[in-house]
Amino acid sequence: NVDISLFIHDLPGKSDTTAFSTADASGSTSQAANVIEGMESGTGLFLIDEDTSATNFMVRDELMQRVFADSEDPITPVISRVRDLYEKLEISSILVAGSSGSYFHVADTVIQMKEYVPYDITERAKAIAAEFPPFTASVRPFALPSFQRHPLPDKVLTGSDRTKVKVMGQESILVNKSLTDLRAVEQLTDSEQLSGLAALLLEAAERAMDGKKTLIQVVDLLEKEMDEKGLLALLAPGRPGNLARPRRQEIFACLNRCRNLKFR
């Protein structure tokens, strides 16, 4: 139930991209959901590596824009939204790229890595880019995504007298029969963080996810508990010990990847 309409619209089959759910996301829809997840978590910066991004989600060159009208392409690429993200929401972006000079037109700063040494080449890059005025097709108006997602109570997480928790390294957590795959959350660095996420998932299920609170409110409540009581707030029979506190962004990542959770 993620609103990815800022980037994805008019999908085949009339899928509603303002409340999008799928079990087989493409590279572009997956990355769109990831960006929206970051926005929902309150991030102020996106770090994007071109090598691990969906090309059609990042940029459309002039020829592609001329051949296919915006109305014929379901994707509004990042390059068409990156200035809006910064100017309207104060969200910066750092992109590692080497495939397209189109990014020079929207970048504030251009840094070249030469033999592992960074050089600021903004002035030169902008001067050369000015010789190649960008062709800009019409882009849908910027509209802030809806973050009114309300996680519903989950019996798999709370319906057992004996809670079983298994932390599988830095890859996933299993709570009762609910598996949360965190392999793609690369910023997690140790199993203690996953233990913390498992405890937070249980805390959210038992005390916060009632179908009335939004996901943002649920995470706010979890962070408030940890701010006031530390990780002791998460200790309870059946829950893992040896915890490390994850960041707000990782809590959102965990809750969004728990396949058992349903939202309204």
Question: How does the language model describe each region?
Answer:
Residues 1-25, 59-60:
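P-loop NTPase switch/communication element
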Residues 19-27, 77-80, 124-128, 140-144:
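Short C-terminal domain-edge/linker segments immediately following a structured domain
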Residues 21-28, 68-75, 89, 93-97, ...:
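Hydrophobic alpha-helical scaffolding
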Residues 26-39:
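Conserved alpha-helical scaffold flanking the Walker A/P-loop in AAA+ ATPase domains
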Residues 33, 77-80, 195:
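Short, contiguous clusters of charged residues that form electrostatic/catalytic patches at enzyme active sites
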Residues 38-88, 96-127:
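Conserved P-loop NTPase nucleotide-binding/switch module
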Residues 84-90, 96-264:
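Conserved NTP phosphate-binding and transfer environment spanning the P-loop NTPase/kinase superfamily
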